[in-house]
Structures are given as C-alpha cells and as structure tokens.
C-alpha cells in the first residue's frame, strides 16, 4: 500500500497527490519532470500513476521532489535501495545537461542585455567573470562524470574501490561562493546606465541557478553518496 515517507523534514507530498497539486504547490518542480524526461500532459493522474506510467521509482521521485521543495529535507537511509543507483545517476546527468544547455546560457543571454548598457571595461570584467564561472561549473560536472558516474555505470562491481566520493565536498561550496560573487558584482558595481529592471532579472536568474545548484549538491551528498555506500556493501 502507498504511504508517505516518514521523515522529519518531509515536504507534504504523498503518492496519491495529483500531479497538478504537486506542481501548484511548488512550480519549480517542473524542472524535475524535464530532467526525468517525463511526458506531458498529466491529465488528472497521481504521483504514483505518473511514476508507473513513466517507469520511475515512486519512492525515489518523492525523495527528489521533497529535496527540491525543501532544502532541509534529508532522505532516510532505510528508504534507499541499491536499485535506485542507476536512476539517480541518470537524473544527475540530466541535471548537468539542464544547467549546461539551459540555465547557464539563459543567464548569459540576460547578461549580454545588461552589457549593452555598460562601458567597455565593465563589459570585459563582467563577461570574463561569468565565463570563468561557467567554465568552473562545467569542469566540475566533467570531473564528476569521469570519476563517479562513468565508473558506476561502466563497472558497477568496482564502485567501492574506484569511485572518488570526495568530489562531492569542497567544489560545491566554491560554486556557491562564485554565484554569490557574481550577484554581488552585478548588484553593487554596475553603472547606472544598466537599467534596474535588467539587473533585477539577471539577479533573479543568478540566484535561481545558485539555489538549484544547492539542491543538486544535496542530491549528490544525501542521495547518491549513501546509495553508493549501500550498493558497495551489497556487492562485497
């Protein structure tokens, strides 16, 4: 029988909840559907019906939705199963593509609109800062692909010995700092010629990207990492 996952910080979702109600409660959850390649429309189906239709684990989807809606949510290890590992890797890979192909270019496009109103020096400084920021994030994604994802997918029996889970630690804090730095630069230092409306829109995109990357980091730390440990213990 379907039941709510019992955890202190669980967002108020249940498998019987209608997809429309889920999205209405937290519209940013739409990005999860994109990353999981879930088909629209949903009609009047529930979370459990949608997961059955799309071939996703209900429990895993509930964890992802709860972590996205409530950044303090931490999945209980008793609900984690080794067979979830492959699906969470695909979700994280899709998240990397979502950032690289959608969020980062979308933010860059708004930056270019701001730069049209700036002097040459401001254009050069801000463009270089954002390019470095983007490059750092993409390099981190590529490192995770080489040292974590490809090892798990390509040679699962070697996960315990080969997977470098230390990559989940410091780089995420650095990405967060860089997100705050570029927001501060836009907020404090751009000349008045850059319209306030454009600066506000740019800041909204930067903060949305930062917050989504924080959620992404939480998924890696509190879902992927313990799943790797659980999988490793079951294959020894």
PLM features per residue range, with description:
Residues 1-236:
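Small-residue-biased structural context
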């Amino acid at each position: 029988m379907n039941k709510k996952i019992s955890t202190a910080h669980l967002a108020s979702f249940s498998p019987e909840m209608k997809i429309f109600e889920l999205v209405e409660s937290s519209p940013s959850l739409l990005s999860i559907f994109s990353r999981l390649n879930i088909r629209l429309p949903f009609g009047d189906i529930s979370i459990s019906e949608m997961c059955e239709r799309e071939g996703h684990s209900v429990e895993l989807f509930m964890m992802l939705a709860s972590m996205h809606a409530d950044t303090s949510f931490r999945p209980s290890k008793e609900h984690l199963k080794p067979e979830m590992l492959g699906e969470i890797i695909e979700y994280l890979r899709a998240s990397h593509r979502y950032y690289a192909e959608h969020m980062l270019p979308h933010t860059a496009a708004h930056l270019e609109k701001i730069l049209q109103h700036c002097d040459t020096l401001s254009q050069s400084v801000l463009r270089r800062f954002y390019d470095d920021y983007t490059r750092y994030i993409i390099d981190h994604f590529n490192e995770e692909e080489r040292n974590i994802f490809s090892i798990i997918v390509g040679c699962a029996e070697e996960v315990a010995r080969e997977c470098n889970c230390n990559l989940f630690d410091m780089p995420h804090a650095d990405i967060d700092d860089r997100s705050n730095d570029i927001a501060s630069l836009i907020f404090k230092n751009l000349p008045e010629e850059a319209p306030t409306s454009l600066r506000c829109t740019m800041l909204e995109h930067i903060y949305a990207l930062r917050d989504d990357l924080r959620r992404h980091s939480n998924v890696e730390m509190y879902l992927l990492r313990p799943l790797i440990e659980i999988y490793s213990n079951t294959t020894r």
